């Protein structure tokens, strides 16, 4: 054994050698497991936003706290703030309206209808990466301007709600009549780690619009909300931007009319900022030195603010009245001829060559400039379909106002889920199709009704597997990101869900349950489907020797087909559902990663996911009735056999084919095939974190615990969309 000179010297002087040197000894430093194994399964995604990160505690009730809010006073304070220009960040034309509208838009605009993630619902603009995206330059200033108001009202208003309300008030104070406002967005206290923002390693890396259809990405460049305002990959070509605009707005569920209305309305107030080259701008908030206290993008050009501000690098003002609502965007768009030019920062934009200088300077009343437009603004004139809509808005300002009001409301509320989640005095009465509306309940079963329904289900001849499968098929469409899907509404019986391959088994069970509904007279099919799962789980638990009553909350209703947007519900069809051993495509991630994705959408913890998969397997709930993962000789019994046999070292697993999606478990001594499994099964033995959980449930003293944990997780999934119980 050798000893370095430094170590020898330390010992000779009586100093501990391990307390010397400059290595980073802070928690989390050093080479991580993810560094060694970058493809490691992200089980940690299931541990996000726990009570350990929440300073308000698990008993905090935001809806109750919001009810104490003086809503009128809050809006009054926001209105006053709009014109309270601060010397450290002066307001353009004495108004922060454009800044706050952009803040609200960029908070909501990250939403993607493909997977329901992103959006304004949790105030994520406060955290990385969004707080430091290139498209969000200067929004750190907007949030700091709001801080005195947030400080004043405390927990009665969340940051997430305040961001959107500030945008609404900015529009209203500028003379626009909004469609309404629904509060109810609850803050979280750490970044969302589950959102896939893309694989690019450099900001503003270009993506072709066609690529957006292959992934749940909402922008054509890394770090942008939608599209590059200079055209695809800085092309400067308005017409070529049309496909990108349609792709990105379409990924939010917006049609052409909504897209034109949002662009025109969003560019009616305020301006862009490009006083000088981007080389003057410092690092983003996450990279900023500690003394800047979370503010980024410091500029050494002039004062760095006001007329010297650099944000996007574009220097565009669309309207003659940039602090008052008007139809000038469309009037100027069609009235003038536009020539390509560059901003002082060198960004490509357009100027109205034949226009007089009619645009006011934001800080010097004696100065005027010509109207300017973004490359993507001119797309609304030169793309044939966008042009038709734009001309209609030009000639009918009231139609534009109505379209923008509705599109803005949709933009800012799209990720909130059903209207039952909305709170506050300005919630619109009208039901909108994108809210997945439900009829009002007309019947709530009594305990006697429930007992009778359970008896009818038990006598129906349906197996435990069928009862459990139909309930899971109904409830498991829920997405925690945008709160869509779930069992309420019984949309499992409607198009498109009734025709999904994954629901083939459920489609055979539904007619039996529909007959029970007809016999009952008043109970909803939605309640009966969930109650079928209750009956199945209770029977399976009893067969395992555990007597347990599965909690059931009645009151679900049945949606109509005309309340169901088929195109939007198609997006809820799973690519994979590891709980049912279903996978439709092999070209998207790994099976085990898709299981984590599904569990995260269902807001499950890792232990909850583990208990549910183990239970679903022994209950025979595979979508196709296969024996994959059914590690038991007593299917239909809610036993811990899945875990016991998975961890049994007498079994040896080998891939059954080159795809390594199907595996055979053989007896090590005889070579006999005892079980078959998928990757969604074997991951509970191969992944070290999941194996640790599986070992708990495989233990000899875990029989009753497993049943209780399965039931708790099951009930959670069945009630994920019961916002009427809040």
Curated annotation (Swiss-Prot):
Pfam family, one: peroxidase
Record-listed cross-link Tryptophyl-tyrosyl-methioninium (Tyr-Met) (with W-105), residues: 226-252
UniProt cross-link Tryptophyl-tyrosyl-methioninium (Trp-Tyr) (with M-252), position: 105-226
PTM section of the record: Formation of the three residue Trp-Tyr-Met cross-link is important for the catalase, but not the peroxidase activity of the enzyme.
Residues binding heme b, per UniProt: 267
Disulfide bonds: none
Catalysed transformations (reactions): H2O2 + AH2 = A + 2 H2O; 2 H2O2 = O2 + 2 H2O
Keyword Transmembrane attributed: no
GO cellular component, one term: cytosol
Signal peptide limits: none
Keyword annotations: Heme, Hydrogen peroxide, Iron, Metal-binding, Oxidoreductase, Peroxidase
Domain of life: Bacteria
InterPro entries named among the record's database cross-references: Catalase_peroxidase, Haem_peroxidase, Haem_peroxidase_sf, Peroxidases_AS, Peroxidases_heam-ligand_BS
Record-level Gene Ontology MF annotations: catalase activity; heme binding; metal ion binding
CDD domains membership: catalase_peroxidase_2
Function, in words: Bifunctional enzyme with both catalase and broad-spectrum peroxidase activity.
Family: Belongs to the peroxidase family. Peroxidase/catalase subfamily.
Protein name: Catalase-peroxidase
């Amino acid at each position: 054994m050798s000893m370095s000179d430094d170590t020898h010297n330390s010992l000779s002087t009586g100093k501990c050698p391990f307390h010397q040197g400059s290595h980073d000894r802070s928690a989390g430093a050093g080479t991580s497991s993810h560094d060694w194994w970058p493809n490691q399964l992200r089980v940690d995604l299931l541990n996000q936003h726990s009570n350990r990160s929440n300073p308000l505690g698990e008993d905090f009730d935001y809806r109750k706290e919001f009810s104490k809010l003086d809503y009128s006073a809050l809006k009054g304070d926001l209105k006053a703030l709009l014109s309270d220009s601060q010397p450290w960040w002066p307001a353009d034309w004495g108004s922060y309206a454009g800044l706050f509208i952009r803040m609200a838009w960029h908070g909501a605009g990250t939403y993607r209808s493909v997977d329901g993630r992103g959006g304004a619902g949790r105030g994520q603009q406060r955290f990385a990466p969004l707080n430091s995206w290139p498209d969000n330059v200067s929004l750190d200033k907007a949030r700091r301007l709001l801080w005195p108001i947030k400080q004043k009202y405390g927990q009665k208003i969340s940051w997430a709600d305040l961001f959107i309300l500030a945008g609404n008030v900015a529009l209203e104070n500028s003379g626009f009549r909004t469609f309404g406002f629904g509060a109810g967005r609850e803050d979280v206290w750490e970044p969302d780690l589950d959102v896939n923002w893309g694989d690019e390693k450099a900001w503003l890396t270009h993506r072709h619009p066609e690529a957006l259809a292959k992934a749940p990405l909402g922008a054509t460049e890394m770090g942008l909300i939608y599209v590059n305002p200079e055209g695809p990959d800085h092309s400067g070509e308005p017409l070529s931007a049309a496909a990108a605009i349609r792709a990105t707005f379409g990924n939010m569920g917006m049609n052409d009319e909504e897209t034109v209305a949002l662009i025109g309305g969003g560019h009616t107030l305020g301006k862009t900022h490009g006083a000088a080259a981007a080389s003057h701008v410092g690092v983003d908030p996450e990279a900023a030195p500690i003394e800047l206290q979370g503010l980024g993008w410091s500029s050494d050009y002039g004062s760095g603010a006001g007329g010297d501000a650099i944000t996007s690098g574009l220097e565009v003002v669309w309207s003659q009245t940039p602090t008052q609502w008007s139809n000038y965007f469309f009037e100027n768009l069609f009235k003038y001829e536009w020539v390509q030019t560059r901003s002082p920062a060198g960004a490509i934009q357009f100027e109205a060559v034949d226009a007089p200088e009619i645009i006011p300077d934001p800080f010097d009343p004696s100065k005027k400039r010509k109207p300017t437009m973004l490359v993507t603004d001119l797309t609304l004139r030169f793309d044939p379909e966008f042009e038709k809509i734009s001309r209609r808005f030009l000639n009918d300002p009231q139609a534009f106002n109505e379209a923008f009001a509705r599109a803005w409301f949709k933009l800012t509320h799209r990720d909130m889920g059903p209207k039952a989640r909305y709170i506050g005095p300005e919630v619109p009465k009208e039901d909108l199709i994108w809210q997945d509306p439900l009829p009002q309940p007309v019947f709530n079963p009594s305990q006697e009704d429930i007992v009778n329904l359970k008896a009818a289900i038990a006598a129906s001849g349906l197996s435990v597997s069928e009862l459990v499968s139909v309930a899971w098929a109904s409830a498991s469409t829920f997405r925690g990101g945008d709160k869509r899907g779930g069992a309420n509404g019984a949309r499992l019986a409607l198009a498109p869900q009734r025709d999904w391959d994954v629901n083939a088994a459920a489609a055979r069970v539904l007619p039996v349950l529909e007959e029970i509904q007809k016999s009952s007279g008043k109970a909803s099919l939605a309640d009966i489907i969930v109650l079928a799962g209750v009956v199945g789980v209770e029977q399976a638990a009893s067969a395992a020797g555990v007597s347990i009553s599965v909690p059931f909350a009645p009151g679900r209703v049945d949606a109509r087909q005309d309340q169901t947007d088929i195109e939007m519900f198609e997006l809820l069809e799973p690519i994979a559902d590891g709980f049912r051993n279903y996978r439709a495509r092999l070209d998207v991630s790994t099976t085990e990663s898709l299981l984590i994705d599904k569990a995260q959408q269902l807001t499950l913890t890792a232990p909850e996911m583990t208990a549910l998969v183990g239970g679903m397997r022994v209950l025979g709930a595979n979508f196709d009735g296969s024996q994959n993962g059914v590690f038991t000789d007593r299917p239909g019994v809610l036993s811990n056999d899945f875990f016991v046999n998975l961890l049994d070292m007498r079994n040896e697993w080998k891939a059954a084919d080159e795809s390594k999606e199907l595996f055979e478990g053989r007896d090590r001594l005889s070579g006999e095939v005892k079980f078959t499994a998928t990757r969604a099964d074997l991951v509970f033995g191969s992944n070290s974190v999941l194996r640790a959980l599986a070992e708990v449930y495989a233990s000899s003293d875990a029989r009753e615990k497993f049943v209780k944990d399965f039931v708790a997780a099951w009930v959670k999934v069945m009630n994920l969309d019961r916002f009427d119980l809040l």
